[in-house]
Amino acid sequence: MLTVTAPAKVNLHLEVLGLRSDGFHELAMVMQSIDLADSLQFTNTADAQITLRCDDSSLSTGADNLVLKAAELLRARSGFNELGVSMYLEKRIPIGAGLAGGSSDGAAALVGLNALWGLGYTAEALESMAAELGSDMPFCVAGGTQLCFGRGELLEPVPPTAEGLAVLLVKDPLVSVSTPWAYQRCKELKGKNYLEGEVAFEQRRRDLREAPWLQPLRAGCPPPLRNDLQVVVAAETQAVQVSLQLLQTLPTPLAVAMSGSGPSCFALFGDQDQCDQAAADLSPKLKAAGLKAWACSLRSDGVRIAS
């Protein structure tokens, strides 16, 4: 049996630049892996069947699941149609949370099955396959701190931080946000201000590459945590409003923001002790508001084989 960990991500920067010719939004982002992670277990089978079970009954384990899509794609590319696997997913990342849980699980399937089946694909080849399945999936393969451009699939690594930065995540377990809805609503509300053309897009990419807070990520020059979807989603999602308000009452965070398309929100701290203390201090108010919380350190890697 093989086990792969699949970490969540937060967006330290999410800038919606404009619309591409293919209808997708052109993005300029900084994504960061954190140590809240799912676990995907693999067992070889001799029946050419690919199956998935999960400890969370609310998650579909049918053909729409990215784990199965990734497994089918990898087997098809290998040409070895006799390969089979039984997979078991332990969910720890909340579903529909803006934390790339599904994408990370799909990336874990690519990495794990590449090893289990002895296919020998490089990380770059796996990232390329991941991009066919989801915009966040290449990042989940690579992990750490990455500049993410295009739809999010074009990666440029950022120097790893030597500091023990941490995040306090909060989410209402009863609320999820549709990513397509969030981007459509963003276009409706902000489309008239979108940039147009590759020259304008590249200037914003260059500005982000040269941002002083990425040289490297550190507490002394914290990221401003821009998220262009935050104002759009928060306006229509009370759970996001409440989460941000509670996090903003804390005395020591470096910055506060929503992650991805939400509804998860987080506060960034200079070290894990401050983060843990904030989680303890805020716990009664979070419980009263029906919010769950996770105090997480930052990771320098993406999905990884654990055993």
UniProtKB/Swiss-Prot annotation:
Any one GO BP annotation for this protein: isopentenyl diphosphate biosynthetic process, methylerythritol 4-phosphate pathway
Q: Where does ATP bind?
A: 94-104
> What keywords are assigned to this protein?
ATP-binding, Isoprene biosynthesis, Kinase, Nucleotide-binding, Transferase
Task: State any single GO MF term.
Answer: ATP binding
EC number(s) stated in the UniProt entry for this protein: 2.7.1.148
List the catalytic residues. 9, 136
Q: According to its UniProt entry, what is the function of this protein?
A: Catalyzes the phosphorylation of the position 2 hydroxy group of 4-diphosphocytidyl-2C-methyl-D-erythritol.
Q: What is this protein called?
A: 4-diphosphocytidyl-2-C-methyl-D-erythritol kinase
Q: What family does this chain come from, according to its entry? A: Belongs to the GHMP kinase family. IspE subfamily.
Quick one: which pathway? Isoprenoid biosynthesis; isopentenyl diphosphate biosynthesis via DXP pathway; isopentenyl diphosphate from 1-deoxy-D-xylulose 5-phosphate: step 3/6
Catalytic reaction list: 4-CDP-2-C-methyl-D-erythritol + ATP = 4-CDP-2-C-methyl-D-erythritol 2-phosphate + ADP + H(+)
